[in-house]
Amino acid sequence: MSNIPSELKYASSHEWIRKEDDGTYTVGITEHAQELLGDMVFVELPEVGDTVSAGEDCAVAESVKAASDIYAPISGEVIAVNESLEDSPELVNSDAYGDGWFFRIKPSDESELDSLLDAEGYQAVIDEE
């Protein structure tokens, strides 16, 4: 069973989002998602300054098994990307909720967070797969 931290919010498409102290949000993929994908070999990140909409594909995680689109859980402006993933995509596998984050976003509509899942809701999504 995958680790699902209770302090995060989740999208049914297997992204997590965490609010930071400065009001921005960090986005990554869940431990469950990286387990399904297997060993990461390449990550394509959005550009800093990109504007993304909730549900829009904005990054790609490529593993030995498949390439998978990564979706923005909320709308906003990309303010940082995890450049460490360019040289070390395996961080997504080893630390999905920490050093394996994908990008940070400055939200344009925080009410979109209300449509995301809590840990229990995300577990239910996994159980239905």
Swiss-Prot record:
GO terms for cellular component: cytosol; glycine cleavage complex. SUPFAM superfamilies: Single hybrid motif. The keyword Manganese does not apply. One of its GO terms (biological process) is glycine decarboxylation via glycine cleavage system. Residues 24-106 form the Lipoyl-binding domain. Binds 1 lipoyl cofactor covalently. PROSITE patterns: BIOTINYL_LIPOYL, LIPOYL. Its cofactor is (R)-lipoate. Keywords: Lipoyl. It holds the Pfam family GCV_H. The glycine cleavage system is composed of four proteins: P, T, L and H. Belongs to the GcvH family. The glycine cleavage system catalyzes the degradation of glycine. The H protein shuttles the methylamine group of glycine from the P protein to the T protein. This is Glycine cleavage system H protein. It comes from Shewanella amazonensis (strain ATCC BAA-1098 / SB2B). The gene is gcvH.
